């Protein structure tokens, strides 16, 4: 029982809650969920509100057509108009008209009314906008006068005129507001007149003249005047009211006209918009028509294609049914099977026949191979027998002659025809074996030569160190001697001449002494150092006066004087180290130490420093010859690239003039030749030095510092520099009238008494002997005075001073370390004197490309010896030289494994003497030779000559 009650209560609560929720559902949500199509709401516009009427209008809804052509079923069917919740009228929807107007009349003034407008569709659904509230206008007081109707005059008949003597007063006129009263008023007057006077008063409107008033009494006139005044006031009031009505109606009409104008403009705009819409619709219609036509065409084409495809599919289905039948497939299969079996049988038959042929061919090949092996063995045996036989001399000479013809003379290469001929030779022939043997011999000789060269380079480095030490000692001693003042004696010239003659005798006597075999270069250097120390001690103790040599007292070039051992060792040391020294010894102080008077006249080649003779006070005959020769060497780059070549000259005193003439003949690169070398000969230079006036310079300028490295001290030492001799000459000439005669290094070396025996005895450059050419080629006169040990050491240290064959020999300083004995016999000399006493040289080469010596190619520069063998030699600044334009050159293949290079070496050995074959191998690591295969002297090369005559002031 309680459970049922509880459930009933819960059910009632649930139902009430659901009812509440259902009632609170908005109508819009219900309409949207049920998808009810309600009619659209129509807006009502109020046009005019009057005191008793209201005018409204609204737009009619046009009927919309659906896609299927039928009319829309949800269009508005009619409208309902309510006034104060009271239905006034039902207006149907007229889609043909745009607006519907309605005027509600019979309303009260100043009363508020509620207007409701409801739209209903054909299904009965309604839609309503919010209600419209409006109030009518108030009614005015003089509204009765504001009428367009004129009030007529109510007095239609004239009243009877009373006589003047009548005493009865007329009755007062009633008001004009009421015609009835007026008409009553008239009827009363008439009755009183008839009753009183028995006649009616005329109307005052008929009284138009004054004569008409004569019959009336004053009272009557008063009454008429009052009535006229009342009428006049009435007319005036009507006039004012009419004017007001006119103004109001005018304003209303103007406003209405403005409204109509705006309405008309709206109508025009609407028409324009409608026209534009119509045009756009027409255009869209045309576009849609075109699209429809295109689509119809596409549809027609697609239909045609579909029909064709259907027909094709039907045909294919028929063909498939015909072709895929089992009977036809079986027939085709059996046909193909029979054909394949027949082809297989034919192929098997062909294979069997081919196998039989192959077996026959293999048997025949085996027989042929056996016969071939037997023939090869017999041929090899015969060839070995023939190769073991020595080649006939005639055949060998013919082969060598052909190869010699095919060899190029300039570079030793084989031509293409020669390489083809060499490749055709049998590799097992005795000629090839002989060539290989010669190559092995050449390689062994080359290895020995390299070993000897490395030993010589080590010796040269040791000698350079000794030279540096000696130069330091020499410089210290010279500074002490140079600082001492010179004594001005009257017999300086005679003393100098006597000293020179005594010096000649002493030098000739000392050079003729036998030399011991154990004497070495170090011994001679020690001898010079001991002499220097003795002179230093004597100068420190006694400080004897110094006398400079007279150039006239120098020994002539044709007088034979034997060199002493000390000078010989000094010369060998100076000759070995000259090639290793740089030209920076004298290049840095040229412009600083050169006087202004010699700025353009002083030659920049090389000058001999002052030669001083120290004479002891005790009258001893012992003297020491101090000779320091400085030579402007070319840069290391030029020294390393140019190779030495031996030449012979008939007169060494005119070497510079000969070089100058050769420079004039060389016109390939005239820009590289200095202008200073175009105006001087040897005689002119000698005359210049003898005629030059001395210039007095203070002794303080000759002082110099003795500190620094041995090689760098040359730069700061004015005495050792090439121009220091001129300063020394000027200082000495301040007290001595005998001028100095400085010479170049070449002339000073040739005029040195210690070298006269070498100058007069024969040539330094001659052909080597078959045996030890460096030690056993000394003439009989030399072997009597010089021991074999000294001669061998001298030849090793000075390779240019080889045994002599000719009469007049120049000493050519050069890169002596790269000269090989095999090239010493390349050139010979013919002596041809000229009219101007300057000897011209005509060089006769042993091969056609002799002129290429003067056109050496300097494009491929090899490193200097110091860089190649890592020698610790002080190197000065390199003077940049102008590189000539490149000329076509032939690069030789220096590989020992090359057939052409090996054959060229063999060819050179076979063409020269047997002794040359042992010494003709060149080091592949050494600088390359000239295009003609010959080495040139560094002094006689083009760059050497340019550096000889080129002023150093231009290189700075």
From Swiss-Prot:
Residues 153-165, 488-523, 552-563, 578-599 have a biased composition (Polar residues). Gene3D superfamilies: Immunoglobulins (2.60.40.10). Residues 40-141 form the Fibronectin type-III domain. PROSITE patterns: FN3. The modification Phosphoserine is found at residues 501, 520, 802, 842, 895. Keywords: Phosphoprotein. Present with 149 molecules/cell in log phase SD medium. InterPro entries: FN3_dom, FN3_sf, Ig-like_fold. Residues 524-543, 564-574, 895-904 have a biased composition (Low complexity). The modification Phosphothreonine is found at residue 154. SUPFAM superfamilies: Fibronectin type III (SSF49265). This is Uncharacterized protein YEL043W. One of its GO terms (cellular component) is endoplasmic reticulum. Residues 152-173, 488-600, 875-956 are annotated as: Disordered. It comes from the Eukaryota.
């Amino acid at each position: 029982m309680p459970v049922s009650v509880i459930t009933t209560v819960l059910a009632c609560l649930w139902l009430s809650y659901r009812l509440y929720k259902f009632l609170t559902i908005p109508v819009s949500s219900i309409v949207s969920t049920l998808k009810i199509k309600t009619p659209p709401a129509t807006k009502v516009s109020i046009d005019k509100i009057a005191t008793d009427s209201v005018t409204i209008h609204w737009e009619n809804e046009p009927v919309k057509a659906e896609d299927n052509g039928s009319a829309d079923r949800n269009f508005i069917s009619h409208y309902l108009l309510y006034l104060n919740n009271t239905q006034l009228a039902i207006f149907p929807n007229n889609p043909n008209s745009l607006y519907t107007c309605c005027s509600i009349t019979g309303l009260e003034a100043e009363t508020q009314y509620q207007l409701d407008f409801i739209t209903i569709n054909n299904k009965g659904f309604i839609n309503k906008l919010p209600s419209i509230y409006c109030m009518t206008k108030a009614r005015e007081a003089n509204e009765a006068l504001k009428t367009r109707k004129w009030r007529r005059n109510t007095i239609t008949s004239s009243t009877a005129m009373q006589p003047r003597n009548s005493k009865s007063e007329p009755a007062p006129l009633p008001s004009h507001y009421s015609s009835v009263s007026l008409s009553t008023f008239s009827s009363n007057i008439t009755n009183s007149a008839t009753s009183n006077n028995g006649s009616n008063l005329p109307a005052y409107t008929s009284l138009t003249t004054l004569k008409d008033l004569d019959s009336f009494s004053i009272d009557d006139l008063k009454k008429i005047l009052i009535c006229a005044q009342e009428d006049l006031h009435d007319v005036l009031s009507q006039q004012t009211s009419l004017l007001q009505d006119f103004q109001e109606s005018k304003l209303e009409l103007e406003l209405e006209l403005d409204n109509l104008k705006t309405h008309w403009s709206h109508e025009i705009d609407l028409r324009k918009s409608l026209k534009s819409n119509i045009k756009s619709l027409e255009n869209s219609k045309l576009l849609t028509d075109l699209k429809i036509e295109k689509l119809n065409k596409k549809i027609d084409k697609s239909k045609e294609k579909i029909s064709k495809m259907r027909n094709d599919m039907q045909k294919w289905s028929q063909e498939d049914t015909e072709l895929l039948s089992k009977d036809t497939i079986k027939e085709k299969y059996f046909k193909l099977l029979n054909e394949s079996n027949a082809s297989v049988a034919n192929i098997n038959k062909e294979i069997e026949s081919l196998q039989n042929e192959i077996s026959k061919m293999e048997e025949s090949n085996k027989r042929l191979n056996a016969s071939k092996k037997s023939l090869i063995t017999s041929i090899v045996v015969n060839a070995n027998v023939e190769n073991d036989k020595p080649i006939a001399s005639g055949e060998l000479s013919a082969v060598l002659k052909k190869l010699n013809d095919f060899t190029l003379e300039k570079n030793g290469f084989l031509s293409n025809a020669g390489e083809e001929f060499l490749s055709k030779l049998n590799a097992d022939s005795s000629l090839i074996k002989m060539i290989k043997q010669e190559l092995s011999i050449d390689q062994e000789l080359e290895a020995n030569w390299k070993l000897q060269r490395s030993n010589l380079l080590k010796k040269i480095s040791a000698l350079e160190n000794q030279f540096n030490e000696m130069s330091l000692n020499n410089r210290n001693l010279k500074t002490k001697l140079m600082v001492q003042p010179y004594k001005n004696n009257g017999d300086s010239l005679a003393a100098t001449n006597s000293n020179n003659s005594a010096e000649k005798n002493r030098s000739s006597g000392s050079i003729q002494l036998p030399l011991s075999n154990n004497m070495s270069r170090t011994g001679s250097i020690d001898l010079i150092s001991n002499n220097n120390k003795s002179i230093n001690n004597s100068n420190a103790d006694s400080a004897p006066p110094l006398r400079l040599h007279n150039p006239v007292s120098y020994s002539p070039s044709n007088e034979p004087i034997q060199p002493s051992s000390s000078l010989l060792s000094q010369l060998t040391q100076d000759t070995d180290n000259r090639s290793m020294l740089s030209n920076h010894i004298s290049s840095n102080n040229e412009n600083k130490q050169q006087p202004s008077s010699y700025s353009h006249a002083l030659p920049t080649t090389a000058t001999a420093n002052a030669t001083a003779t120290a004479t002891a006070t005790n009258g001893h005959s012992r003297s020491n010859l101090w000779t320091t020769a400085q030579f402007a060497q070319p840069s290391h780059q030029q020294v390393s690239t140019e190779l030495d070549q031996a030449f012979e000259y008939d007169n060494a005193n005119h070497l510079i003039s000969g070089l100058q003439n050769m420079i004039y003949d060389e016109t390939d690169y005239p820009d590289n030749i200095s202008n200073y070398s175009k105006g001087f000969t040897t005689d002119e230079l000698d005359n210049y030095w003898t005629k030059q006036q001395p210039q007095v310079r203070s002794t303080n300028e000759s002082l110099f510092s003795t500190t620094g490295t041995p090689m760098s001290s040359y730069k700061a030492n004015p005495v050792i520099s090439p121009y220091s001799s001129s300063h020394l000459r000027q200082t000495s000439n301040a007290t001595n009238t005998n001028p100095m005669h400085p010479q170049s290094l070449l002339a000073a070396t040739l005029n040195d008494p210690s070298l006269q025996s070498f100058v007069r005895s024969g040539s330094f450059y001659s052909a080597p002997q078959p045996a030890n050419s460096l030690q056993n080629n000394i003439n009989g006169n030399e072997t009597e005075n010089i021991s074999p040990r000294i001669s061998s050491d001298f030849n090793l240290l000075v390779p240019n001073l080889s045994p002599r064959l000719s009469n007049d020999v120049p000493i050519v300083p050069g890169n002596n370390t790269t000269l090989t004995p095999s090239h010493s016999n390349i050139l010979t000399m013919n002596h041809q004197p000229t009219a101007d006493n300057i000897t011209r040289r005509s060089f006769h080469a042993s091969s056609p490309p002799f002129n290429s010596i003067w056109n050496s190619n300097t494009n491929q520069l090899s490193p200097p010896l110091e860089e190649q063998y890592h020698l610790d030699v002080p190197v000065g600044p390199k003077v940049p030289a102008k590189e000539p334009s490149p000329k076509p050159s032939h690069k030789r293949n220096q590989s020992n494994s090359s057939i052409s290079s090996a054959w060229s070496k063999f060819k050179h050995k076979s063409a020269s003497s047997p002794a040359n074959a042992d010494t003709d191998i060149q080091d592949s690591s050494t600088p390359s030779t000239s295009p003609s295969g010959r080495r040139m002297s560094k002094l006689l090369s083009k760059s050497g000559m340019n550096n000889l005559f080129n002023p150093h002031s231009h290189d700075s």
